[in-house]
């Protein structure tokens, strides 16, 4: 999709493999029959709306304590797991063993279900055949380097009719060989007794798990396994995910035995499964634990759910009920108080535990075995209601378990996601899902103190995926089911998991540790603006209007002109523009040394030629520059800055074909000369065109239009550069370049060679496309020319790159005085063969979103180390040139405390500092993007559209004052005072200076008037007193004396 950013801000077409899309894709893989079954559950879901119970886990949704997205506890954690952490991988017998009719194995309920319910699936003989190719499985385990292997015993392979009366010798031999091989390799076996493949005989004879007789039969089977294998097995799982056994086996019909619509059966089966597990645990605890010293649990699975509004208690309670009705259904009796959650017991369908049974059931697990995978999220309408959202947040559900069940030790006994069946070894999305899940586990251990002691990646091999049969794959190893030898080929996810195991987590590799240091004192610290819209008339007409006005204070309070009176006026001044005054105040707050903005070509030359020049607009821009220089802020001026919504060309030029017409290049030269002549004495840094490698995207009707427009843009830039070099540089002593959009590219899958090539190809098509002709060879990159030619030969493209004539090659080569780049993010690319008539298809590149990385609201990934790699790549390919980062920033929706932007600035400046100090890249300036924001665009601005400063303003100004990231005890930078503290009162005085001046004048005048009034009042009293004395009669012999 297209982002809503301008050409100066990041915007492109993205492919997002988000969790929501993955859920959608998972639902699409289900058969129509399975989807229809889900409709039966509409009545069941109503039961979950009952209120009454509120467990401790409900606190997990209380987000009143806001946690910043850039808080270390919320970011991807580069750290390692505890030293004794266990790494494993798992399989299910029915999924991988195959050979369902071989060596005496009896049929299971799933064998019948496959043939009766799953159309087009010819049994499990297409499976991985682990029963036959045991050695290949062991080699796969050796490749990964796991410390344990979790597998299940096939009950019908060991006991074909389900009872322990007659063991199948061949099946017994297979499991003994497997266990012996694991012990020999020092791989700990974790054995699951029941992973859904119930012997068919028990289903037909007893009705399966609906019959309580299964409790004793299961205990007999478990006892035999303990006796036979217990000397080599220290970890036992009784049942894998009983919720799915009960709910999908007897409620939705999505699993064997395929019964549906009977809630009584659903809860009866769940009840019997809990009691069966409990009986086996007590059996092991009493009879086998004393000498085998093992541990036993049951694997419980769940989804995770989030309320739409955490301040809506009803939504929160419904989320709690949703978790309790899935995970709590089994966890509460076993890990809790021995009984079902209270709100579930309000219905008459669920069985009751007697007090003795509660005591029997409670505490029958030595650790909490937890499953978190796609089966727990299907179908979505069984776990999601109005006001809720499904989430793949494994960390949160682990916290919920900790709160609900008294901080148990946890083994993640199943975790992973799926890919479509056509994916072979390049399972790139599976890598990111694993990375996300594993890091959430690490965060839970490190930040939340959750006691996770092991992780089971699911699954070792591609195999039968239950209701999805063979339409999805979950294995770390690819298996061609139609081949005879069933070779195990490691997928990218296998390589990745192997690396995780070797590193014991996520040690920091992508970047060196943070460092302290400064940029030089002449470093340009700037801020970038897009097109600066001019004021066509002065905002304040004070002293420019010759008329005198009287304010009618008693009537309508309007101003009335006094006829016949004319006042002396003065010419308008730069300070008369209110917008300039506001802009200068913003620049002063930021303490920048440079300000980059773009001129509006359409306003300066509305007709596109010199026949009509808007001098008022030129004067406005000159005022912007001059007022900034008074403040010590130097300009970098862009002549032409198109955006996605506006090409920025005068209408006559646009009507005549725009950049597809070479006349536009001539018009651009005339326009540039006018700007050099009118503003060049004040401007020393010029950008001709902003992001021409993105502007060409506007001419995307065909790839040839794109390449032609880009070619003409390059010619236009070169002509302007030569014009400046010849006529204006000797006098104005400035520098001219153009700015390129330069995002870095990384292979989305580092284990696939084609992704590495795609990443380099992206850089060639995106950056070298313009950089090679201008900085290097005078011609397009050879990689670009050869790749397009190759696609043409194969009929996959009709693109034709324009050719530079010898004259044009000489014209464009070397027409840059510095390297100006706009960098925003790092793209993770995959090779994808495309066949359209658009230029982007010539790259054969698509993007993948790394869900583990901090991203902005517009999905820009925060990958600071990418800018350092980019700078090193530029230095390596285009020699040691002066480089200006002319735009670097991110969108942040916060109107005041924009924490993502502050984090972004700090980390990207950190990486630029490393490039300068360690890699010796000649970085001359850093310009943050951008000064102000527009109401209709993502919020990239330091100031809001009504000029209110965000907290990033002060943060960036401190970076500038420190000239980087110095150590705390270092001396002040570049003549700065020892303490550069933020003076709130000083800022207020500066901002309110006119009002304060007026107030002082008013108070002074008031004081003078008051003094005069008091003086005259006292004088009058003296005079009155004197007159009174004259009227008093004198005594005889006295005379009046007047002084």
From Swiss-Prot:
Membrane-spanning ranges = 995-1015
Against InterPro entries, the record matches this protein to:
Glyco_hydro_1, Glyco_hydro_1_N_CS, Glycoside_hydrolase_SF
Glyco sites are at: 84, 122, 161, 211, 262, 308, 389, 552, 609, 700, 704, 837
Per the record, the domain of life is Eukaryota
Gene Ontology terms describing biological process: carbohydrate metabolic process; fibroblast growth factor receptor signaling pathway; positive regulation of cell population proliferation; positive regulation of MAPKKK cascade by fibroblast growth factor receptor signaling pathway
Q: Where is this region: Glycosyl hydrolase-1 2?
A: 515-965
- SUPFAM superfamilies tied to this protein: (Trans)glycosidases
An MF annotation (GO) of this entry: fibroblast growth factor receptor binding
In this entry, the parts of the chain located on the Extracellular side of the membrane are: 1-994
Q: What kind of membrane protein is this, topologically?
A: Single-pass type III membrane protein
* Pfam families in the record: Glyco_hydro_1 (PF00232)
Q: Name one GO cellular component term.
A: membrane
For domains, the record's comment is:
Contains 2 glycosyl hydrolase 1 regions. However, the first region lacks the essential Glu active site residue at position 241, and the second one lacks the essential Glu active site residue at position 887. These domains are therefore predicted to be inactive.
The name of this protein is Beta-klotho
